[in-house]
Amino acid sequence: MSVNVNRSVSDQFYRYKMPRLIAKVEGKGNGIKTVIVNMVDVAKALNRPPTYPTKYFGCELGAQTQFDVKNDRYIVNGSHEANKLQDMLDGFIKKFVLCPECENPETDLHVNPKKQTIGNSCKACGYRGMLDTHHKLCTFILKNPPENSDIGTGKKEKEKKNRKGKDKENGSVSTSETPPPPPPNEISPPHAVEEEEDDDWGEDTTEEAQRRRMDEISDHAKGLTLSDDLERTVEERVNILFDFVKKKKEEGIIDSSDKDIVAEAERLDVKAMGPLVLTEVLFDEKIREQIKKYRRHFLRFCHNNKKAQRYLLHGLECVVAMHQAQLISKIPHILKEMYDADLLEEEVIISWSEKASKKYVSKELAKEIRVKAEPFIKWLKEAEEESSGGEEEDEDENIEVVYSKTASVPKVETVKSDNKDDDIDIDAI
């Protein structure tokens, strides 16, 4: 079924159509992903490379994307509904496809990585302008320009160079291809020609250009090493995640990197172990303050994930081992902070407290930590009993208290559900 490219236009005879996006969820657990089955057809209707809308979804959702161009597979990590992605595609079309003047999708992108600009030209109304490059996708477009885009010196100059090369091989220059001499008033001075030739002679060697080329190489390398990383052992992948988080902290951007961290953990297929890495990098003796500061980071891993919550508790044990003198007496308070922040569930905490493990810390320290945690564990169990006891009180509705003249204390009798018309003989009580 096809839909209008510009879905704000309700005209059924609108000439610009595209297929409705089809999404298929594959995998389960940490490896769950959404494959956009007909992304090639959708992108063809929009006159854009299929990598652009896929990457746009990744930018908007904060998810990792994968491109298998050879097999036409375009993947967004995580589970996403087709309707949600279709609505998100409207945003991509509005920003990167529709003409700002006539709102028709007959546009071409003109990317100039050297000047870091993205131009937009419309074949319907003749509009020419520049795109706003503040969106994250623009960085990807600058590094991966469309094949039909005019890059660097442009197609004409490339064709000219190709012709020159062929002429040199043949040992002659075609007179039909020699352009007529320009008027005298338009002849450029010799030094201008030399400068232009120098620009074409070699690559741009400025520091900014070198940095861009290194970024392009690193992005390409990331794509090549994606499958290699998944072939590593779990321990090696956890170490990669540790280095990733540590680098974010050293660069001073850890506060806003929660989405990037969880995306990297999903890419490496070690999402459940993320809290173990985060505790080692982010927590020290000031852990109670840091729980509040980095709550969002941990919540992305621990929400509805009991396995991740258990790793968080193991990570807490490691932090206590490193700062035992300062933290051993504060165990109940730390657990309460994590519980109140919705990072831990009652069931997980109680299960953890019942068995000491020597996998992450010594057996003696693991037991001591659980002994120190007993006040909080007891409070959790009592609160659970009170909540279950409140339900039992509702079952006592059919009990009625009858006072006797001869007895000094009230007598409890059960009132039967079938009411009889016989009068109660008070003297017989």
Curated annotation (Swiss-Prot):
GO terms for biological process: formation of cytoplasmic translation initiation complex; formation of translation preinitiation complex; regulation of translational initiation; ribosome assembly. The modification Phosphoserine is found at residues 10, 227, 387-388, 408, 417. The modification Phosphothreonine is found at residue 225. GTP binds at residues 27-34. Residues 178-187 have a biased composition (Pro residues). The record marks 15 as: Arginine finger. The keyword Ubl conjugation applies. InterPro entries: ARM-type_fold, IF2/IF5, Transl_init_fac_IF2/IF5_dom, Transl_init_fac_IF2/IF5_N, Transl_init_fac_IF2/IF5_Zn-bd, W2_domain. There is a cross-link at residues 411, 416 (Glycyl lysine isopeptide (Lys-Gly) (interchain with G-Cter in SUMO2)). Residues 231-390 form the W2 domain. One of its GO terms (molecular function) is eukaryotic initiation factor eIF2 binding. Keywords: Cytoplasm, GTP-binding, GTPase activation, Initiation factor, Isopeptide bond, Nucleotide-binding, Phosphoprotein, Protein biosynthesis, Ubl conjugation. Residues 194-207 have a biased composition (Acidic residues). SMART domains: eIF2B_5, eIF5C. It is found in: Cytoplasm. One of its GO terms (cellular component) is cytosol. Its main location: cytoplasm. It comes from the Eukaryota. PANTHER family: EUKARYOTIC TRANSLATION INITIATION FACTOR, EUKARYOTIC TRANSLATION INITIATION FACTOR 5. Component of the 43S pre-initiation complex (43S PIC), which binds to the mRNA cap-proximal region, scans mRNA 5'-untranslated region, and locates the initiation codon. In this complex, acts as a GTPase-activating protein, by promoting GTP hydrolysis by eIF2G (EIF2S3). During scanning, interacts with both EIF1 (via its C-terminal domain (CTD)) and EIF1A (via its NTD). This interaction with EIF1A contributes to the maintenance of EIF1 within the open 43S PIC. When start codon is recognized, EIF5, via its NTD, induces eIF2G (EIF2S3) to hydrolyze the GTP. Component of the 43S pre-initiation complex (43S PIC), which is composed of the 40S ribosomal subunit, EIF1, eIF1A (EIF1AX), eIF3 complex, EIF5 and eIF2-GTP-initiator tRNA complex (eIF2 ternary complex). Interacts with eIF1A (EIF1AX) during scanning. Interacts through its C-terminal domain (CTD) with EIF1 or with eIF2-beta (EIF2S2) (mutually exclusive) through a common binding site. Interacts through its C-terminal domain (CTD) with the CTD of EIF5B. Interacts with FMR1 isoform 6; this interaction occurs in a RNA-dependent manner. Belongs to the eIF-2-beta/eIF-5 family. This is Eukaryotic translation initiation factor 5.
